[in-house]
């Protein structure tokens, strides 16, 4: 059985990147929550 995490920079950016977060209402909520919490990095 192969491991489930097969790293890919492109997929990482597309799925969890800043632009991907801004594209949806839920994603914007995530960014707002991370800003409120004072996260140094908001997204991948």
Curated annotation (Swiss-Prot):
Keywords: Ribonucleoprotein, Ribosomal protein. One of its GO terms (biological process) is translation. This is Large ribosomal subunit protein bL34. GO terms for cellular component: ribonucleoprotein complex; ribosome. InterPro entries: Ribosomal_bL34, Ribosomal_bL34_CS. HAMAP family: Ribosomal_bL34. GO terms for molecular function: structural constituent of ribosome. Belongs to the bacterial ribosomal protein bL34 family.
């Amino acid at each position: 059985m192969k491991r489930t995490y097969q790293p890919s920079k492109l997929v990482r950016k597309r799925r969890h990147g800043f632009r991907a977060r801004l594209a949806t209402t839920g994603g914007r909520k995530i960014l707002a929550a991370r800003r409120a919490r004072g996260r140094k990095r908001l997204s991948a």
